[in-house]
C-alpha cells in the first residue's frame, strides 16, 4: 500500500494495454510509476473519470476507455430537500438519561405509484429528532420557539433554563432523498486552464436539475406538510417554493455521485461491460460508483461493494483462463 500518493494517469503500451500508473508522491513531490498486469480504479465516480481523461496516448487520444466519448457523462447524484417543524405536543416530555433520536434518522421507503404522479421514479423520507445538545443564540436557541406559542422570546437565567426543559425534544426534521434521472448533459470534464498543486488537470462539473427533480422536490414538501399538519406541528424552516427549486440541495451535496463511466453491452455507448471491465482496455477495471447506469434513492455503497465482489470473482476467473 502506497500512502500520500496522487495518481496522475494510467500508462498504456503500444497496443493500448495498461501496464502501469503514474503517481505523485506528496511527501517528496516527485513522480513515479508503478507497474501492474491489472489496473483497478476505485477513486470514486468523478476522480476515476478524471484519471481516465488524463490517461491520453496515441491509441487512447480522448482518454483511456473513452472511445465512446462517454467518460464523465451521465453524472448524477441523489436529490435532497428538507423541512423542519416545532411540535407542541412534544413539549415538557420527561427527560431521561438517553441519546434519543438526534442526528440519526428513521428511514421510510418509497411506497407510491409514480405512474399517477407528474415525475418519474421516487424518493424516501428520513425523519430525525431534536434530542441533540441544546443550543443558544440568535435564531437557533430553544427560547425562540416561544413565538409559535404567542409568548415572549428571550430570557436568561431561570427563564432560559425553563425554556430548555420545556422545548427540549420538541423539534423534528424531515428530509427527502430521491432518484435523479441520469442525463448526458450532466457531466464532468477536464478543465483546460486549471491544474491542482501537483500539476494534474482538475475537473470542471456541468450539472443542472431538470423538471423531473424539481417536481419530485415539490412533492416531497407537500408530503412533509401533510405529516406536519397531522402532528399539529408548525413549520420552522425549509419551505421554499418553485423559484428556489423547492429547496433542492446543490448537486453533489448528498454525496451519492455515480454514473461517469457507465456500464453497458455496446462499446459505442458505454465505458465498461457488466463486469466493470473497460471495453477499450481489458485489463482495467472500475469498482466505484462510476459504472452505475442509474441509482435508486438510497446510498449506493452496498451496491458498489456487491459489484466489486462480482468484479473480483470475474478477474480471478479470467486470470485462470489466461484471458487477461
Task: Map each language-model feature to its residues.
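Short, glycine-/Ser/Thr-/acidic-enriched flexible segments
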Residues: 6-8, 15, 24-28, 38-41, ...
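Glycine-rich loop(s) and the adjacent beta-strand/alpha-helix scaffold that form part
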Residues: 10, 22-99, 288, 303, ...
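FAD cofactor-binding and catalytic pocket of flavoenzymes
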Residues: 68-203, 208-214, 254-258, 279, ...
Amino acid at each position: 500500500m502506497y500512502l500520500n500518493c496522487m495518481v496522475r494517469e494510467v500508462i498504456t503500451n503500444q497496443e493500448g494495454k495498461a501496464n502501469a500508473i503514474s503517481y505523485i508522491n506528496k511527501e517528496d513531490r516527485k513522480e513515479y510509476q508503478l507497474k501492474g498486469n491489472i489496473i483497478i480504479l476505485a477513486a470514486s465516480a468523478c476522480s476515476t473519470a478524471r484519471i481516465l481523461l488524463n490517461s491520453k496516448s496515441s491509441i487512447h487520444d480522448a482518454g483511456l476507455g473513452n472511445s465512446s466519448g462517454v467518460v464523465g457523462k451521465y453524472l448524477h447524484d441523489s436529490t435532497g430537500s428538507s423541512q423542519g417543524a416545532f411540535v407542541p405536543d412534544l413539549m415538557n416530555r420527561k427527560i431521561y438519561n438517553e441519546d434519543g433520536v438526534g442526528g440519526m434518522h428513521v428511514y421510510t421507503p418509497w411506497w407510491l405509484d409514480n405512474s399517477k404522479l407528474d415525475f418519474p421514479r421516487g424518493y424516501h423520507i428520513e425523519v430525525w429528532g431534536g434530542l441533540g445538545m441544546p443550543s443558544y443564540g440568535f435564531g437557533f436557541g430553544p427560547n425562540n420557539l416561544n413565538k409559535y406559542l404567542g409568548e415572549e422570546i428571550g430570557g436568561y437565567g431561570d427563564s432560559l433554563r425553563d425554556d430548555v426543559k420545556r422545548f427540549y425534544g420538541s423539534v423534528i426534521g424531515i428530509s427527502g432523498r430521491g432518484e435523479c434521472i441520469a442525463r448526458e448533459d450532466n457531466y464532468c470534464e477536464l478543465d483546460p486552464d486549471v491544474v491542482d498543486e501537483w500539476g494534474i488537470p482538475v475537473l470542471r462539473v456541468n450539472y443542472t436539475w431538470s423538471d423531473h427533480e424539481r417536481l419530485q422536490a415539490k412533492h416531497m414538501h407537500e408530503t412533509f406538510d401533510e405529516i406536519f399538519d397531522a402532528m399539529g406541528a408548525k413549520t420552522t424552516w425549509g419551505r421554499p417554493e418553485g423559484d428556489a427549486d423547492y429547496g433542492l440541495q446543490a448537486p453533489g451535496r448528498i454525496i451519492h455521485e455515480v454514473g461517469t463511466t457507465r456500464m453497458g453491452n455496446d462499446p459505442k455507448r458505454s465505458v465498461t461491460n457488466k463486469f466493470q471491465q473497460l471495453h477499450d482496455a481489458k485489463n482495467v477495471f472500475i469498482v466505484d460508483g462510476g459504472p452505475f447506469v442509474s441509482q435508486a434513492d438510497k446510498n449506493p455503497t452496498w451496491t458498489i461493494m456487491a459489484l466489486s465482489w462480482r468484479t473480483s470473482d470475474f478477474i480471478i476467473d479470467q486470470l485462470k483462463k489466461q484471458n487477461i
